[in-house]
Amino acid sequence: SQVDAVLQIFKVGGGGLAGNDDNGSPDSYLSFKVPEDGKYAVCVSDHLGRGGKHFVYRVEVAVADAEIGTTVNELERYVSQVVNVPKGSRMAIETNMVRKNVGGEARIQIPDLPEKTNHSDGLVAPDLGTIQMIFRADADAPNQSKLVDLRATLAVNPERTLVGHLNQRTQLVRGQNNVDVWGRFDNRLAVAVVEAAPFDIEIVQPQVPIVRNGSLVLAINAKRNPGFDKPINVRLLTAPPGIGYSPVTIPGDQSTIQMNLTAAGNAPFRTWPILVLATTDIGNGPITIASEFVQLEVADSVFEFKFSKTMAEQGKPVDVVVGVELKKPMEGTIEVEILGLPPGTASPTPKLVLAADAKQLAFPVTIPADARAGNYKTVVCRGTVTNDKGVITQVNGNAEVQIDVPVAPPPAAAVAAAAPMPPPPPEAPKEKPLTRLEQLRKEKGKQ
């Protein structure tokens, strides 16, 4: 129909550059960045390319102005976010810094908080759009609630500073597949001071980084009030990019727990502030508090692994040779452990010390006669650097082990009585373990 308009931008003498088919709104709209000086054409047409006397359109063109604002991520999906801060403790939220047609460092501030409460620094780096903010309440803060603004500022230049405010969408009616059918935008966030929690939570500051393809153990301590012995569920408010984890639960009779973090091979190098949320049931409902920030450093991998194919036969031992060296000098005990060996096989020394100048390690592996023949690509190596600061862990793989059925020997021919055996020759020095590529080169040289 004539109301189904398609808006397109063309460069005169060139091709199309942008377009919009009124997706999700009554009218076509697009934000277009002009690539260079020149002449451009705006084309409005019916979706089916038709025309007529009722096909009349008005086009508005304006220079896009810079805008900023803030939103808040929901801790629980489809539940409007509020902030309940227990007395003498903390609560935290994820806040988004919305920038339109502008970039740069910004700051989020929350004026007019309830009495005797404050929040963490709201500095937002130029390359970040989301930060975590902690709300703190003094132990003697009165029970009070307020609707507050999350005010954003960004200095475009010394003469101009942009100011933005909270614009939070609240869904009131959800349709099929949780589609937002009806709701409203609010410019205030509800913050309240509530009764104190029966515990506190803290993260022990890691002294070593987490490296790419590595893992790190976070130590988390709960400080329980006398008589409080309920389980405490612990999760990160948000994990940095490329970092994975699973929530943990502190049993009622314990006060410490470990949370394992893992880093992907492309995790960005950066030092990130992280915190945990701890939730428990106090009888009349759940209560959640936040820890203070600790700094998590994401660094480059420590080990350089090179894996080659290992050929083995049932009933014969074999050395799995792994190329491994340190990318940079490290202090402490450096070890490499082989994991994921084929079923039924084992290594008498699965963990070896890596010398600073080593280029490879050979792991002896016993292959029983009844080991299942086949190709196994499950072998990985875990490298660790242990010193007085902690343990740096990195896991890489996969190495390939091929187990074959041995070839049956030819039948023995009849021989005359053998002469006395000469004394055995002196034992030759043990050869350096060969990689699969070196084995093939050696066999080719014998031909």
Model feature map: region roles:
Residues Q2-G16, L30-N96, N101-V102, R151-V173, ...:
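C-terminal edge strands of extracellular/lumenal beta-sandwich accessory domains
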Residues A92-V98, R136, V217-K223, T262, ...:
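Short edge beta-strand/loop segments characteristic of extracellular beta-sandwich folds
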Residues S31-V34, Q132-A139, Q258-G265, F363-A371:
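Short, hydrophobic beta-strand segments
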Residues L7, I110-S120, L236-S246, I338-T349:
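Short, solvent-exposed loop/linker segments at beta-strand-coil boundaries, enriched for Pro/Gly
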Residues V79-V85, V204-I210, V248, K306-E313, ...:
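Short beta-strand segments of immunoglobulin-like
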Residues D22-S25, K33-E36, L113, G122-I131, ...:
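Short proline/glycine- and polar residue-rich coil/turn motifs
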